[in-house]
Amino acid sequence: MIFTSTPPAPPPADAQQRQPRYPGEDTTPTSRREIWGWYTYGIAAEVFAVCGVGSFLPLTLEQLARERGTLLSSHLPCVGPGSPSAAPGNGTTPAMLRRDGLGSDQCVVGLFGLQINTASFAMYTFSLAVLVQALTLISFSALADYEKNRKTLLLTFGLIGSVSSMLFVFISPRLYILGAILVVIGVTCLGSSFVVLNSFLPVLVANDPSIQTARKTEGEELPHLDSSGEYTRSGSFNRGDNRGFDDYVAPEHGLKPKTTDSTSPEMQLSTKISSKGVGLGYCAAVLVQVLSILLLFTLSKTSLPKISGTLPLRFVLLLVGIWWFSFTVVTRRWLRNRPGPPLDTSKGGARWRIWLRLVGFAWKSLWKTVKVAAKLREVVIFLIAWFLLSDAMATVSGTAILFARTELKMSTTAVGLLSITATLSGMTGAFLWPVVSRRLKLKSNHTIMLCIALFEIIPLYGMLAYIPLVKKWGVIGLQQPWEIFPLGIVHGLVSGGLSSYCRSFFGVLIPPGSEAAFYALYAATDKGSSFIGPAVVGVLIDATGQVRSGFFFIAVLIVLPIPLIWMVNAEKGRQEGLAMAEMLEKSHGENSSEFGHPSEEAEGLLARNP
């Protein structure tokens, strides 16, 4: 069984071992094998994030609904022998190479008594998936910090998520609703597992032999990582630079500014491990994406597409699920349990009642953080901007894939190549923007504004096709399939910069000592907003019958954060954060928590979410 414990490898004979901070803590020095166990889960799940969520799941959902749908005007099947778009020659053109639905009529499917555009169906599904993911992340954030729940939840989410992807091979067009349910499950497990995975990194760093040696040399104790968000921040599974996070440290007792500009050994090691994990995950995703395209091309030469146009896509999702499952098993063997503090059962009651109290504690803690943040003007302005911007980023990705398939009539293999283009550009952007910022001597908020301005090019370019003269040309304004590839490069480059610099800029505004709690709020804002945009675009598609109409909403959504980011005064926000930290420190002993130290309040694992 996947959850059966594997005897851990013995630690090196000369390894330094620190004192445990609570009963049952595993302070065994971190081994290279354990770090690779951490890497392997990123290699496993990032494939589903890029190849599944970012590419083939939206296409599969839309195609499943399309094969079940009818044309709005004539009620004829959207695809198949009886459809107006049936290919000549008895429809022998391979489905993966065919541009389905060449007519302009809207393809709709019945759902709860309503006629919904098949592209809207995919957008609504992902909107619901992100909402469920956000609720799950917040609810499980406190529970995963205790006992062996961390590894158990990681393996559980990985197992359920990978199986949900593999089960798509059995989802025929007749069961398209069940396909939507599997998407919700898969997306929820993906985000939740990454949050739990990130919570391992501070523990691995804390027990690394090199850190113990450095601390012994300096004559210092290792800070309590649970009461400081610093290592949580550097350990986040982010996609870029974390500069600006380490201006202050929060020791176990009291707050103090750093007395040195040098980066701490923990920060250096954490950043090194995190960056390598991100790189390995992206490389795995690109590899599987290439394999998926080859698989699609090979299957297009067989009779499978004649059975169902979605069958090759479903085989790709089977491959993705097998990959996720296989590397999760490796993670289970190589990654130690690293249990957290034991649950307090002194008050009696069943364990499930304690778990319910932990869920309530997570929500209550998040609300307390909201009340503190509401008193910080610069934080409020930035979070409003981030609310809009993160929603725009999530909406553009899903809309672009569906636009390429339904409006540009691109084949599935071409859409896969588009995804690879955006992924490689995102990897480049993570390294490029720090260089651009240094060369142009830009402040962090100016870099963010520049990224947003470039991001705005995508919807504006798509809206050019509404100009009659441009429409008459038949090119420019995303009228030809090749035009979307340069925009895919722009999307990748900009996303890499925004994800890193927004997180870094927010770090300057946080009260020292409350980092993890505020990053929980940051992540909740991200996940809590990302379901709105896809739902609105889905409504617009239903109203107009065109995915292109969503560009109007996206253009407004992208441009709104620019004045807000410009309004944020980083220095003033930093001073407000310091003042708030002093105020919180004075009331430190008055706000003790039922499940942990006062300084741990509102942290949870959600703080480690990218």
Curated annotation (Swiss-Prot):
Where are the glycosylation sites?
90, 445, 591
Q: Which domain of life, per UniProt?
A: Eukaryota
Q: Where are the transmembrane segments?
A: 41-61, 120-140, 153-173, 177-197, 277-297, 310-330, 379-399, 415-435, 450-470, 485-507, 527-547, 550-570
What does the record list as GO biological process?
A: amino acid transmembrane export from vacuole; autophagy
**Disordered: region residues:** 1-29, 216-242, 586-610
UniProt keyword terms in alphabetical order: Amino-acid transport, Autophagy, Glycoprotein, Membrane, Transmembrane, Transmembrane helix, Transport, Vacuole
The family database entries (InterPro entries) matched by this protein are listed as: Atg22 (IPR044738), Atg22-like (IPR024671), ATG22/LtaA_families (IPR050495), MFS_trans_sf (IPR036259)
* Presence of keyword Membrane: yes
Say where the protein is mainly found: membrane
A GO CC annotation recorded here is: vacuolar membrane
List the membrane topology term(s).
Multi-pass membrane protein
Regions of biased composition (Polar residues) lie at 229-239
Q: Which CDD domains match?
A: MFS_Atg22_like
**Places the protein is found:** Vacuole membrane
Family per UniProt? Belongs to the ATG22 family.
This chain's function reads: Vacuolar effluxer which mediate the efflux of amino acids resulting from autophagic degradation. The release of autophagic amino acids allows the maintenance of protein synthesis and viability during nitrogen starvation.
Task: List the protein's name.
Answer: Autophagy-related protein 22-1
Q: Which organism is it from?
A: Aspergillus clavatus (strain ATCC 1007 / CBS 513.65 / DSM 816 / NCTC 3887 / NRRL 1 / QM 1276 / 107)
